Curated annotation (Swiss-Prot):
Region (Disordered): 261-303, 341-373
Protein name in UniProt: TAR DNA-binding protein 43
CDD domains: NTD_TDP-43, RRM1_TDP43, RRM2_TDP43
Stored SUPFAM superfamilies: RNA-binding domain, RBD (SSF54928)
Source domain of life: Eukaryota
UniProt source species: Gallus gallus
Gene name linked to the record: TARDBP
PROSITE patterns: RRM
Length: 414
């Protein structure tokens, strides 16, 4: 006649009664049906209080000499299975520990000035139960300082809130652990990645669908106006870190993934002056090379070329003192030319020379000093500072400042 014996995995657990065979033995298959992986039974001896093993022969468990009795029998497992079970129990304990981890205050940055504590509580209540909200205010004025604190009941809610950006009263805000609350040996890794080389036809939905293949995406942010990059926030920081440094193909375009943490840029921008183009002292504007007009006096298509505060001729520069000396020399030279021209006019025109007074001033030709223009109809293509060749006794610039009549030249040769 069969009887029921009490069997359990642990002495402290509630036992299960399993039936025996008609001959009083218990089949090992009967035990493994209730306890998969079991390989035997043991029990605590009432006299010695030591654990005794039950005899097993060809898959059949034989009762002790005194019979099965009311003892509680503990299941035996192979060592490998026991080790796996211990590891499973340890991992389960870690999961339970994480699940019951206490929440902490979160700092909310970037709050609008008009946001009140009630507004803050109503917003975060959509994520879960809120224990506390506080908007920091100035003691003297009573106005908001633009940040506050919030605490939730559940740790899962806290993690979810920290993993995304929040639009509060029309403004994007960030919610994170304060620096003082962050453990130094367990730094909070970023769940956000920077996606560079984006194109304008990439939408937030398309980015979310693409990155969803790597893990849960909680937020996608594309700055407005478009700046060729975006931010993607994952629920798991390990997914975000695994993608950093990768080049991925989205809609046929190669994008680069990097960490979204702010970096200190050691490269300073150049000063406004001295850049290439559009600034004083640079290339392409006043006092430089290019299309300067008026008071810069650069080489090129200068119009007017007033002798102002210094000129640059390639590597050769003229300061105001040298310019004043040049003006004095030119005035002296042109004074002598005026006297010679008046003497020639009294004796009548000769050759191709024309009176000094009838000389026409052409744009981009000649040299301008104050309101006086010097040039010549036969002075050739006299552009800028003396590049024309003289014809006869014409009054042009021949590679220097001053005048050249016949074989006589006065001024500075260059």
């Amino acid at each position: 006649m069969s009887e029921y014996i009490r069997v359990t995995e642990d002495e402290n657990d509630e036992p299960i009664e399993i039936p025996s065979e008609d001959d009083g033995t218990v089949l090992l298959s009967t035990v493994t049906a209730q306890f998969p992986g079991a390989c035997g039974l043991r029990y605590r001896n009432p006299v010695s209080q030591c654990m005794w093993g039950v005899r097993l022969v060809e898959g059949i468990l034989h009762a002790p000499e005194a019979g099965w009795g009311n003892l509680v029998y503990v299941v035996n497992y192979p060592k490998d299975n026991k080790r796996k079970m211990d590891e499973t129990d340890a991992s389960s304990a870690v999961k339970v520990k994480r699940a019951v981890q206490k929440t902490s205050d979160l700092i909310v940055l970037g709050l609008p000035w008009k946001t009140t504590e009630q507004d803050l509580k109503e917003y975060f209540s959509t994520f879960g139960e809120v224990l506390m909200v506080q908007v920091k205010k100035d003691i003297k004025t009573g106005h908001s300082k633009g940040f506050g604190f919030v605490r939730f009941t559940d740790y899962e809610t806290q993690v979810k809130v920290m993993s995304q950006r929040h639009m509060i009263d029309g403004r994007w805000c960030d919610c994170k652990l304060p620096n003082s609350k962050q453990s130094p040996d367990e730094p909070l890794r970023s769940r956000k990645v920077f996606v560079g080389r984006c194109t304008e036809d990439m939408t937030a939905d398309e980015l979310q669908q693409f990155f969803a293949q790597y893990g849960e995406v909680v937020d996608v942010f594309i700055p407005k106006p478009f700046r060729a990059f975006a931010f993607v926030t994952f629920a798991d920081d390990q997914v975000a870190q695994s993608l950093c440094g990768e080049d991925l193909i989205i809609k046929g375009i190669s994008v680069h993934i990097s960490n979204a943490e702010p970096k200190h840029n050691s490269n300073r921008q150049l000063e406004r002056g001295g850049r290439f183009g559009g600034n004083p002292g640079g290339f392409g504007n006043q006092g430089g090379f290019g299309n300067s007009r008026g008071g810069g006096g650069g080489l090129g298509n200068n119009q007017g070329s007033n002798m102002g505060g210094g000129m640059n001729f390639g590597a050769f520069s003229i300061n105001p003192a040298m310019m004043a000396a040049a003006q004095a020399a030119l005035q002296s030279s042109w004074g002598m030319m005026g006297m010679l021209a008046s003497q020639q006019n009294q004796s009548g025109p000769s050759g191709n020379n024309q009176p000094q007074g009838n000389m026409q001033r052409e744009q981009n030709q000649g040299f301008s000093s104050g309101n006086n223009s010097y040039g010549g109809s036969n002075s050739g293509a006299a552009i800028g500072w003396g590049s024309a060749s003289n014809a006869g006794s014409s009054s042009g610039f021949n590679g220097g400042f001053g005048s050249s009549m016949d074989s006589k030249s006065s001024g500075w040769g260059m």
